[in-house]
C-alpha cells in the first residue's frame, strides 16, 4: 500500500476552521507589536518577545522530550540563519515603529513573492512559472498603490515602509537558506537557537538606541507582549508545524491570504488606522497575488527556465 502524502490531503472542516484561526492570529501580530510600542522601546519589545518565546519553546521541547542538542556541523548553519533572523527582525521592528500595523501586515505578506524569486535561482525544482510570475506582478502592483497613498506621504510612513521592505527581503533570504538546510534537523531547533542568538543583541540594541526601555506598562501593553511571545511565536509555531506535518504545505498555504486581511482589518478596528481606497486596492492586489501563487493546477510550464547551479 503506498504511503500517504500529507500534501495531497483535503482538510476536514475542523482543520479548515483551525487553519483560518491560525492565519488570523499571525495576521494580527503587527497590531500587537504596535500596541507594545506604546509602552516599550522598539528593541526592548523584540528582546522581551523573543526571550519569552525562547523560554516557552525550550520548555515545550523538554516536556515533549525533543532533542535540543545540535549535531556535528549544524552549529554553523544555525548561526548563519540566526544572523539573518536578527537583522530581519531588527529592520522589521524599526520599520514598523515608523509606519502603521495595516501597512506592515501588507508588506510582510510580500514574503512569498520574494521567496519565489530567490528560490527560482537557489532552490532546485522551485521555478517561477507563468502563473507564479503573474501572482508576483499582482503583489507588487499592490505595493505601488501603497506608496501612492496620499495619507501615507503626509504621515511620513514611506521611510518605515522602505525599512519593512528591506526586512522582508532579508526574511526571504533567510527562508530560502532555511529551505536548503531544514532537512538536517527539526524546525523547532532553528527557531529555538535563532531566538536565543538574537535576544542578547536585541537587549544591546535596546540599551543603545531605545530612548527608554519601558515608559508605560499597562494592561494593553502586557497583553500585546504575551500575545506576541506565547501565541504567535510559541503556540503558533508549534500549531502551524503540527498542521503542516499532518496535512502538508499545499493545503495550509491555500489560506495564507487571510493574514493580510486580518492585519488590515484589525489595524483599522483596534488602532483606528485609516483604511483608504489605495490601501483597499493594495490589499486586493496582494491577496489576489497570494491566491494565484498558491493555486495548484495539475500541470504548468515554467515561464523562464534557466540554469540554476550555485
For each feature predicted by the language model, list its residue ranges.
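Glycine-/small-residue-enriched transmembrane alpha-helix faces in small-molecule transporters
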Residues: 2-44, 83, 87, 91, ...
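Specific transmembrane alpha-helical segments of multi-pass solute transporters/efflux pumps
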Residues: 25, 29-30, 58-108, 145, ...
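Hydrophobic transmembrane alpha-helices of multi-pass small-molecule transport proteins
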Residues: 57, 79, 117-118, 131-149, ...
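C-terminal transmembrane-helix exit sites in multi-pass transporters
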Residues: 59-65, 111-134, 261-280
Amino acid at each position: 500500500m503506498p504511503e500517504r502524502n500529507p500534501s495531497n490531503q483535503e482538510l476536514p472542516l475542523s482543520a479548515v476552521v483551525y487553519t483560518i484561526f491560525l492565519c488570523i492570529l499571525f495576521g494580527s501580530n503587527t497590531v500587537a507589536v504596535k500596541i507594545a510600542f506604546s509602552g516599550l522601546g522598539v528593541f526592548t519589545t523584540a528582546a522581551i518577545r523573543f526571550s519569552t518565546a525562547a523560554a516557552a519553546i525550550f520548555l515545550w521541547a523538554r516536556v515533549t522530550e525533543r532533542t535540543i542538542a545540535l549535531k556535528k556541523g549544524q552549529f554553523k548553519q544555525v548561526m548563519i540563519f540566526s544572523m539573518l533572523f536578527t537583522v530581519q527582525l531588527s529592520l522589521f521592528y524599526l520599520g514598523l515603529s515608523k509606519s502603521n500595523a495595516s501597512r506592515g501586515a501588507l508588506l510582510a505578506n510580500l514574503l512569498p513573492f520574494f521567496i519565489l524569486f530567490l528560490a527560482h535561482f537557489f532552490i532546485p525544482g522551485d521555478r517561477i512559472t507563468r502563473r507564479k510570475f503573474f501572482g508576483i506582478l499582482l503583489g507588487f502592483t499592490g505595493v505601488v498603490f501603497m506608496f501612492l497613498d496620499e495619507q501615507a506621504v503626509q504621515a511620513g510612513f514611506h521611510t518605515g515602509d522602505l525599512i519593512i521592505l528591506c526586512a522582508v527581503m532579508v526574511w526571504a533570504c533567510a527562508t530560502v537558506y532555511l529551505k536548503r538546510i531544514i532537512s538536517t534537523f527539526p524546525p523547532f531547533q532553528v527557531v529555538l537557537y535563532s531566538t536565543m542568538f538574537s535576544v542578547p543583541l536585541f537587549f544591546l540594541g535596546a540599551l543603545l538606541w531605545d530612548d527608554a526601555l519601558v515608559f508605560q506598562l499597562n494592561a494593553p501593553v502586557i497583553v500585546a507582549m504575551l500575545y506576541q511571545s506565547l501565541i504567535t511565536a510559541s503556540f503558533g509555531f508549534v500549531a502551524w508545524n503540527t498542521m503542516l506535518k499532518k496535512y502538508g504545505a499545499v493545503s495550509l498555504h491555500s489560506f495564507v491570504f487571510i493574514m493580510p486581511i486580518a492585519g488590515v482589518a484589525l489595524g483599522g478596528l483596534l488602532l483606528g488606522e485609516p483604511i483608504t481606497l489605495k490601501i483597499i486596492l493594495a490589499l486586493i492586489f496582494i491577496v489576489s497575488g497570494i491566491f494565484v501563487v498558491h493555486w495548484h493546477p495539475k500541470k504548468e510550464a515554467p515561464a523562464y527556465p534557466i540554469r540554476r547551479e550555485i
